[in-house]
Swiss-Prot record:
N-terminal signal peptide: 1-15
Species this protein is from: Homo sapiens
Keyword Signal in annotation: yes
Family matches, as InterPro entries: PRR27
Annotated Low complexity bias: 155-204
Protein name in the entry: Proline-rich protein 27
Main location class: secreted
Renumbered residue ranges of the record's region Disordered: 155-219
Length: 219
């Protein structure tokens, strides 16, 4: 049993040495092994290099190259916070802040529904309504010009009453109805010729002469 326990301890110790051969770290505590090799992972926790390393310019500095400063950061994977001015900037290229969409304006009433917010924003449109009384002034001037025109027909109304006064003239024929009754009363006048029948009978006096002739004819 003791031999089995010792065998387990030795296996664990050797396995740890093979898995992490850089247990002894350098004095700077960077996590780099003292004797690195090509088949070991980078660092004990696989962390990026520290930020205080001196930046390295990757552009070759040969004699014909006059543009050696690109302005790029040495560690492009380190991003700056949004809204913070960039330390590294390419000349002739717009800033990232200029490419960003401008933020929306702050709303004065964050808890008010949009319909009420827009109606409250439309409230300043009331001053143009106050200017409408100035437009009503010409309306008051129009009745003044209409009064004389309206008065003239009023003065002409008596002329229109003249036909009303002429109605008695129309009543004159009504008064003539008795004249129409006159023919009714003329009937007695028509009876007057009846007494004149004797006057017509005067020529009829010779009638006895033809009557005998008729009698003779009858005989």
């Amino acid at each position: 049993m003791k031999l089995l326990l010792w065998a387990c301890i030795v296996c664990v110790a050797f396995a740890r040495k093979r898995r992490f051969p850089f247990i002894g770290e350098d004095d700077n505590d960077d996590g780099h092994p003292l004797h690195p090799s090509l088949n070991i992972p980078y660092g004990i926790r696989n962390l990026p290099p520290p930020l205080y390393y001196r930046p390295v310019n990757t552009v070759p500095s040969y004699p014909g190259n006059t543009y050696t400063d690109t302005g790029l950061p040495s560690y492009p994977w380190i991003l700056t916070s949004p809204g913070f001015p960039y330390v590294y900037h390419i000349r002739g290229f717009p800033l990232a802040t200029q490419l960003n969409v401008p933020p929306l304006p702050p709303r004065g009433f964050p808890f008010v529904p949009p319909s009420r917010f827009f109606s409250a924003a439309a409230a300043p449109a009331a001053p143009p309504i106050a200017a409408e009384p100035a437009a009503a002034a010409p309306l008051t001037a129009t009745p003044v010009a209409a009064e004389p025109a309206a008065g003239a027909p009023v003065a002409a109304e008596p002329a229109a009453e003249a036909p009303v006064g002429a109605e008695p003239a129309a009543e004159a024929p009504v008064a003539a109805e008795p004249a129409a009754e006159a023919p009714v009363g003329v009937e007695p006048a028509a009876e007057e010729p009846s007494p004149a029948e004797p006057a017509t009978a005067k020529p009829a006096a010779p009638e006895p002469h033809p009557s005998p002739s008729l009698e003779q004819a009858n005989q």
